[in-house]
Amino acid sequence: MDPCDCSKTGTCNCGATCKCTNCQCTTCKKSCCSCCPSGCSKCASGCVCKGNSCDSSCCQ
């Protein structure tokens, strides 16, 4: 289950490095909102995506 409901509420409890599109957080886990770019089909569970990049540690 996702740790927050960004798609429903538009907000979530996050920090300060992640660029999110559908919520007003600046840092979040992948399951919180779409931090990773469209090229990243799936992020590792519990992964914190940093910035707009998605590397091998975040993707699987």
From Swiss-Prot:
Binding-site residues, a divalent metal cation 3: 14, 18, 23, 28
Chain positions recorded as a divalent metal cation 4 binding sites: 32-33, 43, 47
Pfam families: Metallothio
Signal peptide location: none
Amino-acid positions noted as binding a divalent metal cation 5 in the UniProt annotation, renumbered to this chain: 33, 35-36, 49
Stretches for region Beta: 1-28
Binding site for a divalent metal cation 6: 36, 40, 43, 59
Keywords noted in UniProt: Metal-binding, Metal-thiolate cluster
Domain writeup: Class I metallothioneins contain 2 metal-binding domains: four divalent ions are chelated within cluster A of the alpha domain and are coordinated via cysteinyl thiolate bridges to 11 cysteine ligands. Cluster B, the corresponding region within the beta domain, can ligate three divalent ions to 9 cysteines.
Protein name stated in the entry: Metallothionein
High-level lineage: Eukaryota, Metazoa, Chordata, Craniata, Vertebrata
GN (gene name): mt
